[in-house]
Swiss-Prot record:
InterPro entries: SAM-dependent_MTases_sf, tRNA_(Gua-N-7)_MeTrfase_Trmb, tRNA_methyltr_TrmB_bact. This is tRNA (guanine-N(7)-)-methyltransferase. The keyword Plastid does not apply. It is an enzyme of class 2 (transferase). Keywords: Methyltransferase, S-adenosyl-L-methionine, Transferase, tRNA processing. The active site is at 108. NCBIfam families: tRNA (guanosine(46)-N7)-methyltransferase TrmB. It comes from Anaeromyxobacter dehalogenans (strain 2CP-C). The lineage of its organism: Bacteria, Pseudomonadati, Myxococcota, Myxococcia, Myxococcales. It catalyses: guanosine(46) in tRNA + S-adenosyl-L-methionine = N(7)-methylguanosine(46) in tRNA + S-adenosyl-L-homocysteine. Its EC number is 2.1.1.33.
Length: 201
């Protein structure tokens, strides 16, 4: 399923989706992936954890459509793919404190200084992510750009996230970690991946 929304659409709390109706029992453990790309993580997650529901938001329509089609072909009823900007969609789709986890893998680092304001992990988005998570909920952030990772950990800790590895520190790969399509390439070549596992207290 592909979903889009106009940029100026109002936030109508009474119209928030009934995720339990959409996903059944899996809707009781709702997780979000921002930026699904080619869908390696989303597909792997949905297969590995059928008891959990994943909503993926991908801004590129082609990628979103392809991933949705793959999910349908594999009968992954616990996966829903939406097309749009997560900064606009997330507050219209999820109630505060409703997500068990949010996954942000390899977001665009926007290298040029004048483009830094386009980075996903800015002050406003960091606060939004914290607000959407339930107490004890986890933000799973990964990047191949060390500088971006170091800037992100400072900003995310400042808005109130607790760093499970310790202040300013990066996490090790979890035993049940599902790699994204892009991450597999880095792991195969031995290049480092910078991970954050941040918890809402």
């Amino acid at each position: 399923m592909i979903f889009s929304i106009e940029d100026d659409a109002p936030i109508v709390r009474d119209l928030l989706p009934d995720w339990r109706a959409r996903f059944g029992e899996a809707g009781g453990r709702l997780e979000l992936e921002i930026g699904c790309g080619h869908g390696g993580f989303a597909l792997g997650f949905a297969r590995a954890f059928p008891e959990r529901a994943l909503v993926g938001i991908e801004q590129r329509r082609k990628f979103a459509a392809e991933l949705a089609a793959k999910g349908a072909r594999h009968g992954l009823s616990n996966l829903l793919v939406l097309n749009g900007d997560a900064r606009l969609l997330a507050p219209r789709l999820f109630a505060a404190g409703s997500l068990a986890a949010i996954h942000v893998h390899f977001p665009d680092p926007w290298w040029k200084r004048r483009h830094h304001r386009r980075r996903l992990v800015d002050d406003r988005m960091s606060a939004l992510l914290l607000g959407l998570l339930a107490p004890g909920g986890v933000l799973d952030f990964r990047t191949d750009v060390e500088r971006y990772a170091r800037e992100a950990v400072v900003r995310l800790e400042e808005v109130g996230f607790r760093n499970a590895a310790g202040p300013g520190r990066f996490a090790e790969a979890a035993p049940d970690e599902i790699p994204s399509t892009r991450e597999r390439r880095y792991l195969a070549s031995g290049e480092p991946v910078w991970r954050l596992r941040l918890v809402k207290a």
